[in-house]
Curated annotation (Swiss-Prot):
Its main location: cytoplasm. This is Ribosomal RNA small subunit methyltransferase J. It catalyses: guanosine(1516) in 16S rRNA + S-adenosyl-L-methionine = N(2)-methylguanosine(1516) in 16S rRNA + S-adenosyl-L-homocysteine + H(+). PANTHER family: RIBOSOMAL RNA SMALL SUBUNIT METHYLTRANSFERASE J. One of its GO terms (cellular component) is cytoplasm. Pfam families: SAM_MT. Keywords: Cytoplasm, Methyltransferase, rRNA processing, S-adenosyl-L-methionine, Transferase. Specifically methylates the guanosine in position 1516 of 16S rRNA.
Length: 261
């Protein structure tokens, strides 16, 4: 697969029990169900839900959304609660749990953290396959008694976030959260298998300035942009202040103070 060629994908049932579900996802995503020797990725359906596997000898393993076990469960239990930097960035404080629009949801990890801390979170993902992984993960989370109350605070929308924000109807989110993909090649991030999936399927968010502009127009209280720590700010309005971590930075664009309800 070259950088300029669109990746080839096919849908695969991991056993006969999942053949009907595989047909469903193939139709939903507009992907072939038959095996393709030239495919770069397999969209697999099985007991653990929907997952994407990069094919080839150097495959990093399947990628799925799992809010019940693994990294998300560990962070929910031991991640530092409202003392986490992301919590401070969106304005979580005693008596304040803002309504958040996560406009670049990806695999939903940050959105889940915010929902686990009590925020109502709307997630937007523009890439249909990534949105499908997130939809499947949320559906499984809603069936788990421990995680269901958190998943109930998460709502998923598919589509272009900038367009959705410009056409927003109803009560505006208090906070818009952006974590765009950028062309900066951070080697420590690229080794993660999620990045191996995202680069060819999603590409970089070259419309980040337009996303920021739409977010600033919609958010009632603040916009938060997550960036690699040493990366430049997004072109456009300048942040009011930043919170720096070891590898990431949160640029905060305040509009008005978040107060107790």
């Amino acid at each position: 697969m070259t950088d300029s060629a669109a990746p080839r994908l096919h849908v695969q049932a991991l056993s006969a029990d999942w053949a009907e579900a595989a047909r469903h996802w193939a139709e939903r995503l507009g992907l072939p169900l038959a095996a393709d020797d030239q495919a770069d990725f397999a969209v697999q359906v099985g007991e653990q839900g929907l997952q994407v596997l990069q094919l080839g000898p150097d495959s990093p393993g399947p990628v799925r959304v799992d809010f019940v076990e693994g990294a998300s469960a560990h962070r929910r239990k031991f991640g530092g609660g409202s003392g986490q930097m992301i919590a401070k960035a969106v304005g979580i404080q005693p008596g304040v749990r803002p309504r958040v629009l996560d406009a670049t949801a990806g695999l939903g990890r940050d959105g889940f953290v915010l929902a686990s801390l009590g925020c109502e979170v709307t997630l937007v993902e523009r890439q249909p396959l990534i949105a499908a992984l997130l939809e499947d993960g949320l559906e499984r989370a809603r069936r788990d008694p421990d995680v269901a109350p958190i998943a109930a605070r998460m709502r998923l929308l598919g589509g272009n976030a900038a367009d959705l924000m410009r056409a927003w109807e109803g009560e505006a989110p208090q906070v818009v959260y952006l974590d765009p993909m950028f062309p900066h090649r951070d080697k420590s991030a690229l080794v993660k298998k999620e990045m191996r999936l995202f680069r060819p399927l999603v590409g970089d968010d070259l419309d980040a300035p337009a996303l920021l502009e739409a977010a600033l127009a919609l958010a009632s209280h603040r916009v938060v942009v997550k960036r690699p720590r040493k990366a430049p700010v997004i072109d456009g309005a300048k942040p009011g202040y930043s919170l720096d971590g070891k590898s990431s930075r949160y640029d905060i664009y305040p509009k008005k103070a978040l107060n107790k309800a």
